Amino acid sequence: MDLSESMEVDNGTTSENLKHVQITFFSKDKDLPEIPDAVFDVPTVAECDDLNLLLNKTIQATDDAWKEKKFEFLVGETFLRTSLAEFIEEYEVETETILKIECIIGIEAPKPLHDIQAPDWVSSVQVANGHTKSTNLFSIFSTTYGGDIVIVDRKGKETKLSVNSANRILKCSGIVRTTKKVQLEGTEFIVGGENQLLTLYEIEKGALVEKIVFRGHERAVECVSVNSDATRAISGSVDTNLKVWNLDPSDEATIYEKEEEESSAKKKRKKDTRTKVPMVTIGGHRDKVSSVVWCPWKSGHAFSCSWDHTVVQWDLELAGEVSRIKGPKSFTSIDIHPTSNLLISSCTDAIPRLYDPKNRDGAMVKQSFIGHQNGWVESVKWNPVDENQFVSVSTDKTAKMWDVRSSKSSLFDIHGHEDRILCAAWNEGLIATGSADCSIKIFETS
């Protein structure tokens, strides 16, 4: 196919008036057929639609079964979003040699699904496992600075509950157990906050029932993460410590019993609510712990990040440090992909950074992602089913969906919030964001 002829028709020009550049296509995607390594002489006015047409025709010429697809194009580490001429000028691309263009299968932009008003600033948000388009069970779980819990099902129906406790600013949450029963019956989750406690709640007959209170931190609890079999939780605090908690209902070893006499009312309450102390306390950070995640490749290990500019891998059984990453700023969040094992991080600046914690040079930044404009990135979350994609949310009021193959331009910008975005989650084809504008926005991804 001669792309120059197409350009002449569209622009009313002749091939003599068009500047040209030589390009070749390639792909690292194993799901794509082999792309012919032919060199094409194309006009620099060509845009993505023109390159899509050329590439599809090229593949069809060698593969009769090929069905046309939409591609995204990368030059180096930047997505091509303009004409070749504009891209070459903006990024000062050398055109004396053949321009190599990487092809990846295109995806649709995230679609707004629900916009939920919360009673206060949204401090944490989770997307539940196993609740897909075919179910109407709850998908989104969130907490607020006012002590509220907001639960949203796939159709956007809201359930708002309150912990009804003084000084109960909630800062973090984790889903412990979900059920397929109506009215959320039997759902369990753990929350932590300003009062230095974590609490495990169960929903019974549409109401919150306090099951376990976890006592041990000396300042506000900033983060919590539940392991895959929901038997352990790890938390981090402004007190700079990590604590590991036993969630197993049959556990007796970490139950705290006060020796002094208690009122009959308190005794009655204790029949329903247990107080537990930590299994392990780990010190090692020098400032508040802002995020914790379980290690996907090593049982009994976890990662934490802190405002002391470090990410640390811990052996929880030995209560010792395994490795340490030193960052340029205070860390605000981390997430580790379950299959690639790469660690994405955010700091008190506008740049998400990628690390490989399993590599000997894991403390070195693999990539820095440039795109947020002001303030800092509050949270980053991987797409658990695609090791190339993650989302970042920022105090600049935007969320950005990234592909790790492009560090200089995001896949999509997600707008809608009117104030700082404080938290994010990505699971089951849903991105959820929570903001200081007192709203939770839910987007559907392809």
Curated annotation (Swiss-Prot):
One of its GO terms (molecular function) is ribonucleoprotein complex binding. Its main location: nucleus. It holds the Pfam family WD40. WD repeats lie at residues 171-211, 216-255, 284-324, 326-365, 371-412, 416-446. GO terms for cellular component: nucleoplasm; PeBoW complex; preribosome, large subunit precursor. PROSITE patterns: WD_REPEATS_1, WD_REPEATS_2, WD_REPEATS_REGION. SUPFAM superfamilies: WD40 repeat-like (SSF50978). The keyword Nucleus applies. It is found in: Nucleus, Nucleolus; Nucleus, Nucleoplasm. Keywords: Nucleus, Repeat, Ribosome biogenesis, rRNA processing, WD repeat. Residues 21-105 are annotated as: Ubiquitin-like (UBL) domain. One of its GO terms (biological process) is maturation of 5.8S rRNA from tricistronic rRNA transcript (SSU-rRNA, 5.8S rRNA, LSU-rRNA). Residues 256-275 are annotated as: Disordered. Belongs to the WD repeat WDR12/YTM1 family. Required for maturation of ribosomal RNAs and formation of the large ribosomal subunit. HAMAP family: WDR12. This is Ribosome biogenesis protein WDR12 homolog. It comes from Caenorhabditis briggsae.
